[in-house]
Amino acid sequence: MTTMRGWILAGLLLAAVVAQAGEMHALEVEARLRDYFFDAARRGDQAMLKEFVEAGFDLDVQDAKGYTALILAAYHGHGGAVEQLLEAGADPCVQDARGNTALMGAIFKGEVRIARRLIGAQCSPDQRNGAGQTAAMYAALFKREELLQALSARGADLGARDALGNSVESLRRGELNGTAAAK
């Protein structure tokens, strides 16, 4: 009887180890798939993104910095990939670990066409990042006047202030927290 229990216990332990190894393998596979997904967005590889979309992959999955495929595609200037991800249901309002959105990244990088598309998304034009900054503040700071006008037309609060007291108007003038910004 004791030998039988020993064999059963050994079998259960072996099954647990195998199951855990399978789970570890599944986690590794999932991590690699996320890496491939983010790399495809970073490169603007629409064929690869299409495979992920058709497979039902979570389009709003985030990496360690909180970046989504949409944030990466916008930041790297891949308008076709941005459009593809939006049409497939990616959420343009998702914020990274610092609270920045795909729109903020596009404005920062000067991707005007992509930013215009994202301004048309159903996100609040006054969505704030972790520093209290809005997309309009980014547009003012980086001298993207046409985007600032588009955000204003969407109802952005141009009188808002960030955590340091900067406003759209002060940023437009190159003033950061009461000091002149380097020009």
Could you tell me what each predicted segment is?
Residues 140-183:
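Leucine-rich solenoid repeat scaffolds
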